[in-house]
C-alpha cells in the first residue's frame, strides 16, 4: 500500500526491514 511505501521512504530501510520482519513473523506477507 501507499502507507508502506511512504513509511519506507520517510523512515528509511531500517523501518522497512522491521516491517517486513514483523509481517514474516505473523505470516501476513
From Swiss-Prot:
GO terms, molecular function: galanin receptor binding; neuropeptide hormone activity
Any GO CC annotation of this UniProt entry: secretory granule
GO BP annotation list: neuropeptide signaling pathway
Modified sites of kind Alanine amide: 29
Keyword Secreted tagged: yes
Record carries keyword Kinase: no
Location of the protein in the cell: Secreted
Pfam families, per the entry: Galanin
Record's function text: Contracts smooth muscle of the gastrointestinal and genitourinary tract, regulates growth hormone release, modulates insulin release, and may be involved in the control of adrenal secretion.
Full protein name: Galanin
Organism: Amia calva (Bowfin)
Gene designation per UniProt: gal
Amino acid at each position: 500500500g501507499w502507507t508502506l511505501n511512504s513509511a519506507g521512504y520517510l523512515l528509511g530501510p531500517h523501518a522497512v526491514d522491521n516491517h517486513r520482519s514483523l509481517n514474516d513473523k505473523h505470516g501476513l506477507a
